[in-house]
Design a protein with these regions (language model features):
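Exposed loop/turn and edge beta-strand positions of beta-sandwich/beta-sheet ligand-binding modules
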Residues: 51, 86, 98, 137, ...
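Transmembrane beta-barrel domains of outer membrane proteins
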Residues: 56-58, 93-95, 101, 142-146, ...
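Outer membrane beta-barrel
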Residues: 21-34, 44-160, 262
Length: 327
């Protein structure tokens, strides 16, 4: 299967030579590292890891229609029910006019929060809420309305995060605002109705906020969840905070932590608990260094811990980008 994927990429490169005016950006990206962990019994383990190997491509079909592809090359590309298992993005975005747009294809399931919105290759450890969502990408459609260049509202109908195959009759109905309240306050807010198995459903209100002051930014995500199962309503919430300092675009130092009260994804959208815990607390921090003038090479050192696994983790690693087409 991997040979087929690489062959398709080679075809894309051949096409790009003749039609580079339609491809604005294409690149490989990868992340690898050395992972160390110590549990509460002082048992030590370490190993090298290959975390991500992706291919991304951006371009335009016409002046009003753009597209994006992101393929994970180190993930099983096909499953029995989902031939796009390793494909995060495969969509086109039609700008109908200055206000309206339509996105169709495999895309992000719009759930509010800045942590959730990050590309996985840029996240070293997750909150309980994000870590247990079965999938963050699905096939669907999103109608967007732009109030101005900094504020867009999406109405999205897409496969549910709990729909693990294309044959499931599970959908998610999402209303999401990607916005900017002021020069120092950005938002990713959403309200979601998510279908689960066995006639269960989830309701999210997810409020992601980013506050920027000089070389600092603070991200604060708050998510309220209601699990509507056959017996009663289950209310839970999650909070994630991240404080980052940037030094001359060469170094980022951050701390990040959060708390989940009875994480909804441990309850899942099912009748029985899934790895149920009363609560989930995590914290950590790290440093990223960019030795080149651009951001194509990144070195990192990160520490993190959570009270579910009860392991102290220290990662050293590198992320790099190999550009194929860049305009």
């Amino acid at each position: 299967m991997r040979k087929i994927t690489l062959l398709l990429l080679a075809m894309c490169f051949a096409i790009s030579i003749k039609a580079q005016n339609h491809i604005s950006n294409a690149f490989f990206e990868a992340r690898a590292g050395f992972h160390n962990e110590i549990n509460d019994n002082n048992k030590y383990h370490n190993h090298f890891t290959g975390d991500f190997f992706n291919f991304q491509m951006f371009g335009n079909i016409t002046d009003n229609i753009s597209y994006r592809v992101r393929q994970r090359l180190n993930k099983n590309p096909f499953t029995e029910d989902n031939i796009f298992n390793a494909t995060d993005f495969l969509y086109f975005d039609w700008k109908i006019n200055d206000k309206w747009s339509l996105m169709v294809g495999k895309q992000e399931i719009f759930i509010g929060g800045f942590e959730y919105d990050y590309a996985p290759i840029d996240v070293y450890y997750w909150s309980g809420f994000c870590n247990e969502i079965p999938q963050s990408y699905g096939i669907g459609a999103a109608l967007g309305y732009s109030f101005d260049k900094d504020n867009i509202l999406y109405l999205q109908i897409i496969n549910s995060p709990f729909s693990l195959g294309n044959k499931d009759d599970l959908l998610s109905y999402n209303l999401a605002w990607f916005g900017k309240v002021s020069d120092w306050w950005k938002t990713i807010w959403s309200t979601n109705y998510v279908q689960g198995e066995k006639d269960n459903s989830l309701f999210y209100v997810a409020l992601g906020n980013r506050f920027e002051i000089n070389d600092f930014y603070l991200e604060a995500d708050i998510t309220q969840t209601i699990n509507n199962n056959e017996d009663d309503l289950k209310y839970t919430y999650a909070f994630v905070g991240k404080l980052n300092y940037n030094y001359r675009d060469k170094l980022d130092a951050f701390i990040k932590g959060g708390y989940d009260k009875e994480p909804i994804c441990y309850y899942s959208a099912y009748n029985t608990p899934f790895n149920y815990v009363d609560n989930y607390t995590f914290w950590g921090g790290g440093v990223e260094y960019f030795p080149l003038k651009n951001k194509d090479l990144r070195l990192h050192c990160v520490y993190y811990y959570n009270d579910k696994d009860k392991k102290h983790n220290i990662d050293f690693g590198v992320t790099w980008k190999l550009n194929v087409v860049r305009k």
